[in-house]
Amino acid sequence: MWRMLTCDTVTGELRRPIDIPSASWSLSVSDASLSTTRDKGAGEGEASSITVPWTSVWGRTARERARELTAGKRGIVLGWEEAGEFRPLVFGAIGQRTDTALDTSFSLDSVQALLSSRYVVREGQFVKGAQPLSLSGLSLRAIAANVGWYATEGKPGGSLPIDWGDFYEKGSHERTYWPYNVGNLSCADVLDKIANVIGGPDLTFRPYMADAHHVRLRFLGGSDADVYVGQERECVLQWFHGAGSVHSMSVAHLGPVERVYATGSGSEEEKDVHLAEDLTYCRQADPWPLVEESMSYTDSDDHSLLASHAEGRLHSDWWPMCQVTFEADLGDPQVPRPGELWPGDAVTLRVEGFPTLPDGDYRLRLMEMSGDLGTTVKYKFDPMIDPAEA
């Protein structure tokens, strides 16, 4: 069954259970969200905030109730409890809160949202002529871990319950962050850019119980050799007419992008540019029409970084793709429990009898999972090369 508790944002210390009558949640590789639904049991129509009746909030006095849900200081943990074990799934800090006589409504800021208000500037180094933060000879996930540390533990009052991992893992990468460029140094933005370069690793935060009274988050990243986050075991799910461990499966299809125009730093005719293209699909006997994209990367004057971002975009969009989505019921013992399967994990999907997906086993990587406080969970997977076009 699902359980929700309040906690302290800085330490992750659990406080008390809180009863939110109706809520929906979602997890992706890099982010998480939780919100109340307008109609209990409806899979559609999420509100932008969580609404809690005062009868569900601990406290006998106005001060106690207000402090239990202090914006910024307090958070919410959603997890799954089964056989006496609680597995946290979603962690977030209480954001802007609005109270009425009957209830209180607030947003829930995920870790990425919190890090969007932190900047990768060394403490005491935001002065004229300050030297940059230079990180070199490291793996991309080690650079990301250092970026996170400087934006949290490296600042007064900056602590968050995050285990950043290995700061010193060797690699061939380097990054330089100048204080004067602070407008482009939001920690969340920097982490996104590390993940989005060609060969960039998956970066994710996964909550866990550090002890019976504290929740923490592990910062996990793929290695330079394998960009995907590791997993303990790979589950097998099945779809076929009338049975199987998953249902309501759909497959979306998308054609290829053959060209990406990328612009970098500079102005007008001096602006740095890079063209990434592969016109193979346009030159087939049965050709695809040309599809182009444009992008901008102005955070650095390093042309190789601009090229890396452009080639990474082309590599992800060039193939004719399809994307699988399905639902599963947690009441089915064949379905992995919350906390056993995470976005970023690989899953083997065994298909038989789907109209446009040939029979066989497909190794898919989970991109997003979502649900409400019931037992139905929706899974969306990374796009894969369309087997009908391969």
Predicted regions mapped to residue ranges:
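Short, ordered beta-strand-loop transition motifs
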Residues: 10-11, 21, 28-47, 95-104, ...
